[in-house]
């Protein structure tokens, strides 16, 4: 096929207009590469654009995936023959790439046999797995209170420093060791410093081994705050495309992390304004629900494997009715809320069991026993929360015997919801624990039944199963 060329005729920041012949007009979402060949410019130009609109008379309006500084009218735009394509496969593990699939970790080219387009159809109805199945994470508080749906979408809410990254690292570690699966991290409009910190932490924790895909469990795809809005809008699709390959071609259960899904919406709003679309409510793009749906509907379980996504969600001005978070909520199967109040008393992971929810905490999916134990745990923690004002004003001695027992069990449950993580061993000094769901349900059932009322609450802190609590209690007795 002969190469198809166009010419740059207008540049408005990240929006670039290109003139083609009417007979060779490329399709919407086709990638173009603008080069400075034949132009005397200080820095050579090699910028990828994506066609967003056909303006008529052979003109197309594109959005740049890289900065357009130095680009001038008249430069050649090469039709790449299809949408942006990115490397997929095991060669991406342990590597950091950008929105167009180029490595940014200075470890040389990404060695893969295949590249896939970032724009793809969601799996058809007949390809999707129809059974609702729980995804075991090995983290007690998540598995018990807000179980993840295999192939589902989970919202992770939390401010700075409450442990979002550590929860993400542990999930990546557990999915690799227990499920033999892979993880893909999509940094959407995040701070460059945070991306660098995550890369270093993953390396130290052994989640990735730079330059050795066989020893790495995660691929990283970054589009930082400094990138043009086009890159921030499309980087989530790049990360999803990498994850889809592991689901469809390797048949694995894959984890996809998106941090932050709000910035995907924010970038879409910027692009929409650049393209001259009429804004809708609160200034967001009119196609907000469509853009979100196109991304979220591709995250699902098929008969071959699953992509389970954990999405960090920023809520502007803590307003949950804002169109950006409200549109995201419509797609979520579970919400995990990290609480600063729990970090202040040293409970890690700092997941708020009363603020977190899951669609599959249902006796028909997780079983009657799991459901009853989870509701019992939430009930006793709620009673403890209701009694805290009385305790603060009058003291614990003013409570009835039943209330004192409730407080005692609630404090044990609260401490037992803490858990040592494999990826945090060097900080906590506790060896990491992966707790199977059967052990989690059994342990909490026994606490609710009062079988461990005589054990001091200190013995429950940073333990895996109830058997470890017994061992700690025996040691405490022996040392007393």
Swiss-Prot record:
CDD domains on file: ATP-synt_F1_beta_C (cd18110), ATP-synt_F1_beta_N (cd18115), F1-ATPase_beta_CD (cd01133)
A Pfam match: ATP-synt_ab
Keywords: ATP synthesis, ATP-binding, Cell inner membrane, Cell membrane, CF(1), Hydrogen ion transport, Ion transport, Membrane, Nucleotide-binding, Translocase, Transport
PROSITE patterns: ATPASE_ALPHA_BETA (PS00152)
Subcellular location: Cell inner membrane
Protein name listed in UniProt: ATP synthase subunit beta
Residues the entry annotates as binding ATP: 158-165
This protein's record includes keyword Cell inner membrane: yes
